[in-house]
Amino acid sequence: MQESINDLNINPQGIYIDATFGRGGHSKAILNRLTTGRLIAFDKDLDAISYARENFQFSNFEIVHASFASIYDYCLQHSLLGKIDGIIMDLGVSSPQLDNAARGFSFTHNGPLDMRMDVSKGITASQALEELSVDDLSYIFKVYGEERFAKKIALRIKDYIQQNGSIRTTLELAELIRATIGKKEKKNPATRCFQALRIYVNNELKDLEALLENILAVIKSGGRIAVISFHSLEDRIVKQKFSALINPKQELNRITKMLPQDSSQIKLKWITKKSKANEDELNQNVRSRSAILRVVEKL
């Protein structure tokens, strides 16, 4: 979303972080606006790291193989706390990850049931299905995927694994889900469970919460944070965190019934409260239809 770059209000001499490099779309747009400034990009995906090293050989650019949850620690180690002019985060799975069946994210193209963004560590989605109990699996589908038939699907999966040993491929899982609940809407019936499993395997929501918890220490006064989310769980976390720092009086009164707080507790202000992709962006990338942009500035 071009709006996300515009709303960062790039300082040509500033220090910026692209928390989710992907294939460098946002990084390239930021670098084009920098003169003596620098950009630090993060990604868990080794394919993204390789792409950055091959195609972004700029003296003012650095790529870090790590989750964005480690941004605070990186800034602490490099004496950058409170010196960052802006951070952009484009959450969720990237198009190259979805389009590569071998990565295991797609429920329409067959591949190994992996789903790890960082294939150098962690358990695969296939292993997770084997190790999780029915109750845990049902919880993941319900909470991370907002799946109405979570328990029914979890029971069917565990029964299938007991009879067949494992679920090894993406289409094997997608077909099992479809056979369990049928096709009741336009969306592929496997959509929610695949999302939930991916979030679990990659600790996506925990990583997001970890970054947002320390983000004020990273950003300088006047610095901006732009977050693009693609589903309600991510967006809810972002909105609630930002809202609590923009209007602490409202949050505290509603939750704790405490007296109104003084204005010194207000840490952020809205630049873009909520924005969706425009028609041109939708024509270029249909996957952006569910994207929500929120941008704040540190006071």
From Swiss-Prot:
GO terms for cellular component: cytoplasm. Its EC number is 2.1.1.199. Keywords: Cytoplasm, Methyltransferase, rRNA processing, S-adenosyl-L-methionine, Transferase. It catalyses: cytidine(1402) in 16S rRNA + S-adenosyl-L-methionine = N(4)-methylcytidine(1402) in 16S rRNA + S-adenosyl-L-homocysteine + H(+). InterPro entries: RsmH, SAM-dep_MeTrfase_MraW_recog, SAM-dependent_MTases_sf. It is found in: Cytoplasm. GO terms for molecular function: rRNA (cytosine-N4-)-methyltransferase activity. HAMAP family: 16SrRNA_methyltr_H. Specifically methylates the N4 position of cytidine in position 1402 (C1402) of 16S rRNA. This is Ribosomal RNA small subunit methyltransferase H. It comes from Francisella tularensis subsp. tularensis (strain WY96-3418). The gene is rsmH.
